[in-house]
């Protein structure tokens, strides 16, 4: 038995010697060149100049005899969205600020003006007086997929710009934490800490995919790791342009709660109608099934909500419903969503 083991060991050593002789570089550290190292450095270099530090400063008085002084009340991050100085951040970062200061990665510091904010998405738009600023590329054709690499860039705990890496854990998340509104969060395990809010979530190509917003374990006082969320850039862009144009986000309002019908005919079942809402005024009832909205059928709940949200207040839409076997067209006057 020992003889067999001895022969096996000899054969193993001989085979190893042949391999090392044939491929001498295997025993040389130069086998791994800089080009062989997996790195996201190029993605970070593309995006990082457009990620800024945001400081919320408020007046405070240490004592009755001291004059009021501006002190940092909150901090976060922001993303430069246009070359002429429009910046997206989270509303909770700049809420109740007496002064908003933005620090760029090149060392330049600006006082920012608040253009407007949106409660439902927790987004705010700032403006600084600067030109030819760096922005992050976007790719509308590239879908965010579960399993994609995700890089979060921000200013956690005011340490300075930092990058954390993870993957896209899920998309289309709703009912997250204490957040309100029409949610469609990107979930990631890339770390988002205090100070990261309002920063960039990018992919491995350096393209902007979301605005970092919250972490469940840090907002709900729960022991949780890797449950971090970002607002998809498509929603963030929509909010940005509406705030730049109107100073706020104006949304259409319908006033129903709903779920997808379980029967083979499809449709959206109304499970609740808000009193005095446009739906209630139009005569829509619990149990009605929405078949079409302005002649568009086979809609998901999310698609229906988006159509209504994009409809200007005081616009009439035709809602086709099924009630007790009858198909009825009901005109509904869309009102403005009471965001507060």
Which residues are covered by each model-predicted region?
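Positively charged n-region of N-terminal signal peptides that target proteins for export
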Residues: 1-4
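Serine-dependent protease modules
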Residues: 6-12, 21-266, 274-275, 301-305, ...
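Short hydrophobic alpha-helical segments used for membrane anchoring or interfacial signaling
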Residues: 80-81, 321-325
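Conserved PDZ fold ligand-binding element
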Residues: 87-88, 279-301
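A general beta-strand register signal
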Residues: 103-104, 292, 322
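A structural signal for beta-strand boundary/capping segments at domain termini and interdomain linkers
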Residues: 109, 327-329
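Exposed beta-strand face motif in extracellular beta-rich ectodomains
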Residues: 315-317, 328
């Amino acid at each position: 038995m020992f003889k067999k083991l001895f022969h096996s060991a000899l054969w193993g050593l001989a085979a190893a010697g042949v391999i090392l002789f044939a491929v001498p570089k295997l025993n040389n550290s130069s086998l791994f060149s800089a080009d062989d190292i997996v790195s996201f450095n190029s993605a970070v270099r593309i995006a990082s100049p457009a990620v800024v530090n945001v400081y919320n400063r408020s007046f405070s008085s240490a004592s009755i005899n001291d004059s009021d002084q501006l002190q940092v009340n909150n901090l976060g991050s922001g993303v430069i969205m246009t070359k002429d100085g429009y910046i997206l951040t989270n509303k909770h970062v700049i809420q109740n600020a007496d002064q908003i200061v933005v620090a760029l990665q090149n060392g330049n510091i600006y006082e920012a003006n608040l253009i407007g904010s949106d409660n439902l998405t927790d987004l705010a738009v700032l403006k600084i007086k600067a030109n030819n600023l760096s922005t992050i590329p976007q790719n509308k054709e590239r879908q965010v997929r579960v399993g994609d690499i995700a890089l979060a860039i921000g200013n956690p705990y005011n340490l300075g710009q930092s990058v954390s890496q993870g993957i896209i854990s899920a998309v289309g998340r709703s009912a997250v934490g204490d957040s309100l509104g029409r949610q469609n969060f990107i979930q990631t395990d890339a770390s988002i800490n205090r100070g990261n809010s309002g920063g960039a979530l990018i992919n491995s190509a350096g393209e902007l995919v979301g605005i970092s917003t919250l972490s469940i374990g840090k907002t709900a006082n729960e022991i949780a790791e890797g449950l971090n969320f970002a607002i998809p850039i498509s929603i963030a862009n929509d909010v940005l342009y509406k705030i730049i144009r109107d100073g706020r986000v104006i949304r259409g309002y319908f006033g129903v709660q709903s779920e997808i019908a379980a029967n083979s005919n499809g449709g959206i079942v109304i499970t609740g109608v808000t009193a005095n809402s446009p739906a209630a005024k139009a005569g829509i009832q619990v149990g009605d099934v929405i078949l079409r909205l302005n002649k568009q059928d086979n809609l998901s709940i999310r698609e229906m909500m988006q159509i209504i949200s994009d409809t200007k207040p005081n616009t009439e839409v035709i809602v086709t419903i099924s009630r007790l076997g009858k198909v009825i067209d009901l005109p509904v006057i869309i009102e403005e969503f009471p965001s507060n």
